[in-house]
Design a protein with these regions (language model features):
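Conserved catalytic region of serine esterases and O-acyltransferases that act on ester linkages
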Residues: 90, 100-147
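Extracytoplasmic ligand-binding site segments that recognize negatively charged/polar headgroups
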Residues: 95-97
Length: 147
């Protein structure tokens, strides 16, 4: 069975359980791998976007565009580091903060620019403002809304 088919069946099963309980389902769109991950592939984010958007549409589930935010951030600022340097898979503190801002804005439809939290001041004001801007723009563009 293909990875995509397995993903679609799993999403359908889990989303049905969630919706049958009276709750709303959301799909957290993952980000693509980066170097040094052995499976780094420039096409990966396109495949991820299609897979999550299709699954969200087919199952009436909210798609939270974290992967797109990572892509947008790397496109705008290729020098930023959002992944752990040793594996290229897991987000570092900045990547985690960006993801949290996207989740916040997607669920609340409130701009993450209004979030004051910076992980106990571990994220400097410049990075915080940049990541909030990326999250804000990504969510607005993905859902075609104004935050």
């Amino acid at each position: 069975m293909s990875e995509r088919l397995t993903f679609n069946k799993t999403v359908k099963n889990i989303v049905n359980k969630i919706q049958n309980s009276g709750a709303e389902a959301a799909l957290y769109m993952i980000h693509a791998y980066v170097e040094p991950h052995e499976n780094t592939n420039p096409q990966m984010i396109k495949d991820i976007k299609k897979m999550y958007i299709d699954a969200g549409n087919e199952n009436n589930a909210l798609v939270i565009p974290v992967g797109i935010a990572f892509e947008n951030s790397y496109s705008e600022n290729p020098d930023i580091k959002l992944h752990k340097h040793y594996d290229g898979s897991h987000p570092n503190l900045l990547g985690t903060y960006l993801a949290a801002c996207v989740v916040f804005a997607s669920i609340t439809q409130i701009s993450p620019k209004k979030v004051e939290y910076s992980y106990f001041n571990k994220i400097n004001n410049e990075d915080k403002a940049y990541l909030q801007k990326i999250a804000h723009e990504t969510v607005e563009n993905f859902y075609d809304i104004n935050l």
